[in-house]
Amino acid sequence: GGSNALNSFMSLMSGEKGDYFATHPLLTEALSGCEDSCDVIGLNYLTGRHVLEHELHPHKAVLGTETYPADIVRLWRIVEENPHMIGDFTWAGYDYLGEAGCGIFHYDGGANFSSIYPERTAYIGDLDLLGNRRPISYLREIVYGLRKAPYLAVLRMEHNGQTSSK
């Protein structure tokens, strides 16, 4: 229960499930009062709503205020193709202590946010605690058009043929 249940729910909110939730009429109704009073509409984890917001509020800018790092390919395409989109802030650029293991890929059916001792970091940032780049940072660099050279990331052999939690 509590925050772990909410975090587990949020980890499901990407792809088609996330888009269904993001564009549901009940959410549109719930957000309308707040959005009507803002000049810029900031959305956390609602990438599927970015284009819809322009249809609902054609004179307002939209910003991804928190998004999943692995959604960058899809998200950046939306930003580039829609002038009302002014950018994106991913969660999180730098890894941090707390929410232990929320960025770890599980191959045993385990859910995100179900850390195993001795995990301490979220393991989700583009940079680790020491400032070293993690593989997702290279993907972001490629998506932004800042890197032309290939980057090779390798799946550990013990997980060959297994499906990950993300």
Model-derived regions: residue spans:
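Extended substrate-binding grooves/exosites of carbohydrate-active enzymes
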Residues: 1-166
